[in-house]
Each structure stands twice: as structure tokens, then as C-alpha cells.
Amino acid sequence: MGSFLRSFRRDVGSSTPSVGATPAKKEPLALPITPLEKMLQEMGSDSVRQDGSDKFFGMENYGNTCYCNSILQCLYYSVPFREAVLNYPTRTPIESLEAALAKNLRYQNFAANQEAEAQAEKQRLANAQRPGAPPAQPPKPEDKDSSEYKKKIALQSLPLLETKNNAGSYGMSESLFTSLKDIFESVVASQSRIGIVRPQHFLDVLRRENEMFRSAMHQDAHEFLNLVLNEVVANVEAEAMKQPIPSLPPADTTDSSRQSISSGSKTPNTTRWVHELFEGTLTSETQCLTCENVSQRDEIFLDLSVDLEQHSSVTSCLRKFSAEEMLCERNKFHCDNCGGLQEAEKRMKIKRLPRILALHLKRFKYTEDLQRLQKLFHRVVYPYHLRLFNTTDDAEDPDRLYELYAVVVHIGGGPYHGHYVSIIKTQDRGWLLFDDEMVEPVDKNYVRNFFGDKPGLACAYVLFYQETTLEAVLKEQEMENMNASAADANEAAVKPNGFPQPAGLAHVHSASQIPVQDEPQRHTGLRRAPTAPQLPTHTEYPGPDIEPSSPAVATPPPVPPIPETANRPLSPKKSDIQSKKERAKEEKERKAAEKEMEKQRRKEQEARVKENQRREEAELKAALEASKASKADEDRRNPTENGKDGDPKRSSNGLSRLKRGSKSFSQRLGKDKESRASSSGLPSVPSAEPLTPNPVPLEPVQQLSPRKASPPKESHVVHKPLGQDDEPDALKSPKGDRAGHGKWRSFSIRKKSFSILS
């Protein structure tokens, strides 16, 4: 393309003679080379692709049509979508396209445009010098680095491609789809690789069929994308209804049918290609909390709109999109199984993944306080490669891998004004910035500038992901590393101050000249990069204009240069990859060590807990044994009166003695009364009958002394120690405690019997 443009410029310069002009005046009118042309020249632009993937045309902005330009560029550089548009219903014959391009493609005369602009400026100044005219403001110098200046130069120098209605050549009636197809076919068939498309015909059809786009107001790019896809589906299905269903070709004519597609003949009227590319299926799962019945409902989508949160990512936004939602109060769910409104849980999952995933970041939110839409400047990180996790269990190809190929950026403070641009990844030329008429190459890291936290009010609004494979990703990374290695090797051959480096020291940089990468994950890798070691602050190789402060020292003869291949500088990217692998390995080992330490710590803690439990159980058992022993000792020393806690045999013996003691005491009283009666001459009183049915032989009871016969104050028996003088007979008695207890019990019964008799 560069050779074509150079020949075109030479023809333009020779065909525009200027009367009385000198060659010196033509120097300022030289056409400046654009960054895109420079990139194409460096990468080799002699071979032109037939599929149109290496055509880079801007689009003219008719007021507020940047929303249309950005979306059309993203759709054009989607290879499957572009091929489907070109092939339905047939490809336009080459002769018809060439005839249309001969009328619609117009090459401009940059020198003539510059001269016309200069004449207009002179006329303006002359009008300002007339008497009575207001003083003219001095013209401001143009900023040649601004996008407005670049767009102006592009409009004056690049070929202009105007599209007309060409629907009759492929047998369709005019519609939004046919106007889109005309743009794609004109760009693909153009012999020029760069230029500017004038989509006036497309905008006319759009405004004719949709009233909302007829005004000059600022429009939403996402709404326009949704409208274009739905209109394309409607136009294609309407056209398919008009045509008869074609019969399937024989199996041996498959190759010939493929050739007929490229030559411009009819293709099978498959109307599902838009659905196969952009359409996905969402499944709404609702579980009733009363009966736990789960109901599912499928929904079709052409793009996913996700809510945003501050300092989040696309993955977290998708996780929130599929989070469970409680349906309660006024939003209760009508359960068919229960037959009424019930509380339920609802969540959204993806059942079928699209081949091209359009993610709409909802940056415009309606606020109740302001009663209008407000733009959200939240930082939302989006990756180059994406895998969706919020899929159903029966999803088709749930592990599909996506790569980012286009970003639509909104620049502005609100939804009602601003500007749209698109950043698109091409097949062989890297990333390009499409800003209406201007097309410029950008670095891959340039895409990271639109997360939402950068100054300038520029935020990513629509993300386009297309399916890819892991092999393609690895191959692309390998190519990027090779290109970066070659570029770094070229830069290392010349010092930044312009002096050539010594041949054997091409890999040495000063401490202030360490190359810094823009990508954040590469900063830590520079510590291990062999291409940039830390050097002392003094200068080892001063330039020719630097005089040493100390006396000159004789230097040895110069060492012969070492071949460059022997000391070829290592690529920073390769060193970065190695350092990343080492860091990943160290991180993995560190995590494994931490995990092992945590596991050991848990084991020690569990062992301490078990030991404490065993010690507590042993202490409790010892306490119980000691309590039992003390209880037995206490029972042995202090037996109870009623015999409940004492020996039952001893208790029964005590009762028998009481019975015997009571009878003997009553008999003795009866005998005394008889003796007194006989002496006094009174009649004898019969003795009381014993209470027990079986009489027990009486035992003689020893006569108690008056001191011992005094009754105790308390009704219960008080046991005194054996060492006291009150019970000398108990120590001498062979029966021990039993005899003693018998005495005291018989004494208490005597007291009671005595009171009864008296």
C-alpha cells in the first residue's frame, strides 16, 4: 500500500502545476506520513489479503455519529460476522463491485486542498482589514499531535469511499442489512488499504426506519448495537421467506459449491448465522422455599448487560450477575406446585455460550435524587482472556475460552454528551485505535487505560470477546515475545545519547537507563533481568566531551570486539518470563511450606487439646475416687441412727435389743409394783401386754447409777468418744460398740416407757 500511495502522490504532484510558483513553495505542502502508513511500511505491505482483514478505513463523523462509527468498526473486524454478511445471500459479482468503486472511490489532491485552505485564510484576513470591520483574532497555532488536526489531514489526503445502494446486484431489497453489506463489500474490494468511508447512505436508511435516530442528539452505542443485530436478523429472515427453499446439493458437488460462493453465485439461505455468532441462552432458576420445587425458564440474549461495583472486575460483575436473589414481600414468586405466592430464590446462569460475547458495562445509572442518568466512573478491570464460570451443569462447551478483540470507549461526563472511539485487535497488525476518520496503531497495554480510574473521563463501555483456543493463545504469546526480543535487540545496539556502545558491552546499561516496562506485572521481574544489572554511580565510559577530574591513567590496549552473537542481549521479556516462572515456583513452594506449617500447627493444637482433656478426665476421676473414699471413711466413723446408711445387720440387732430392753424394763416395773402392793396390802396391777407378737426372752439389765440415769436434753442419741469416763463399761464389754449402743438405746426407751406409765 505504501508503494501505491507514493506513486499516487507523485501523480498528484505532477498533475497540479502552479503558475508562477517556485519549487521552494511546494515543500510545506508535502504530505506527512501517518503512523499507520509507517507501520504498514515497516511490516511489509506489498501483499494484500482478499478477505479485507488488512484494510484500515476510518469513518467520517456527520455531527454526532461517532456511536455508529465505533460499532460498525467492531462488527467489520469480527471475521465470522464479516464473512457471513459478505456471503448472504450471495457475493456481489466482481464486475459490479468494480463499477461501483469507480464511481464511489475518490482520491483527493492534498496540495490543492492545502492551497484552497491557504486562499481562504488570506481572504479572511483581507476581509478583516477593511475599514469598519471588527479586528480579526490572530489564528491559533494548530496542535499537530491533536486528534482534530489528524482527522483534518486525513480528510484532505486519504481516499474517500462513498457507498450507494447496490442491493439489486445480489437480489435483495434495500434495508439496513443491505446498506451494511455495501460498506463491507466496498472496503474489501478497494485497492487501497487506507482511506475514509462516508456512511451517509447507511445513516439515511437508519434514520428512515428508526425515528429515535433522526435527531442530532447524542445516541447510545449499546442501544445502536442491539438495534443493528436485531434489524439484521429481521431483514435476513424476511428475505429468506421470499425465496424458495433450495434443495441440498449432492455430496460430490461440495467443492464446486464452495467455489461458486467466491465467484458470486447463490448460497444456501441460512438465516441462523447471527444467532450462531451472537446469541446465547440464559436459564432462570427459581426455587420455592416452601416446597423446594425448582422451575427453569430460558431466555435468549444477544449481549450481556452487567451491573458495576467500585474496584471490581468483569469476573466479579458476572459473579454478581449470577448471584442468588431473594423473592419476598411484594416480589414473591407464584409457585405452580404450591398454587400461590411464595418466597423463593432466583439466580441466572448461562446455558449456551455465544461465539462472540458482547459485554455491556452499565456505566449509566438512573438516580432518584437527580431524576436522570448519571455516569459511573468505577474501576472495572477486564482481562485479555476470559472463561465464564456461571454456566449450568448441562451447558454446551462450558470451558470455552474467549479473547478480547474490541473495546468501545465512552469519553465524557454523562450519557447525554461525549464521544465514542473503538480499540480493535486485527489479525496481523496488532491493536488499532479507530477515532472516526483517524486510524492509528497503539500498543497492547493501551487497552488497559480505560478501566475507569484514569483521568480524561474515558471508560470502557462495551467489550467484545470472541472464542479462541489455548493453542492460539500460546502461539500469539510466543510471537509477541519474539517481536519484543527483536525490538529490544535493535534498541540495545545504540545508546540513548546517540553514541554507539562497545561491542562487548551491549548488554550493560547504567543504573538510570534500566528499561522500564509499562505492564505492571513486569516491574518485579527487572530485579532478576541479566540485561540491566545495578552499576556504581560513577561513569565507566565517559563521552568524548567529558574530562576526568583525576590525572589520566594509562589504559591497556583495547580488547578486540567480541562477536555480537556471543554476547547477544537477553530479551527482557524472556528474562521476565523466566523470573515469572521462578517467582511462581517460589510462591508455590512458599504456599506449600505455609500450608505444611499450618497443618503441623493444627496437629499440635489438637494434641494439646486432647492432652488437656485427658488430664481433666484423670483429675475428675481422682477427685471422684477421693470423694468416695472420704465418704466411706465418714460413713464408717459416723453411722446414722436409723440405719439407712449403716449396716443393716447392725440396725436390726439394735432394734431387737430395744424390744428386749423395753420388755425387761416393764417387767421390772411390774415386779416392783407387786412387791409394793404386797407390802402395802393393795391389789396388784396387771402388767401391760408386750407389743410384739412373738415374745423374746428377757435379758437382765444392769442397774444404772443416778448420774448415768439422767436423760439427755435432745431426743437423738449423742455418741461420745471412747476415751471419756462416761463409758468405761463399753471399753470393757466384749461386744464393743454394740453393747454401748444397746445401753443408750435401752435408756432412751426406758425414758419414753417411764413417761407413758406415769
Curated annotation (Swiss-Prot):
USP domain segment(s): 57-468
The keyword Hydrolase is annotated on this UniProt entry: yes
One Pfam family matching this protein: UCH
Regions of compositional bias (Basic and acidic residues) in chain numbering: 573-650, 729-740
GO terms of biological process kind: carbon catabolite repression of transcription; protein deubiquitination; ubiquitin-dependent protein catabolic process
Biased composition (Polar residues): 253-268
Reaction(s) the record says it catalyses: Thiol-dependent hydrolysis of ester, thioester, amide, peptide and isopeptide bonds formed by the C-terminal Gly of ubiquitin (a 76-residue protein attached to proteins as an intracellular targeting signal)
UniProt feature, compositional bias: Pro residues: 554-563
Recorded GO CC terms: cytosol; nucleus
Coiled coil: 573-631
Record text on subunit structure and interactions: Interacts with creA, creC and qutD.
Protein name per UniProt: Probable ubiquitin carboxyl-terminal hydrolase creB
Gene name of the record: creB
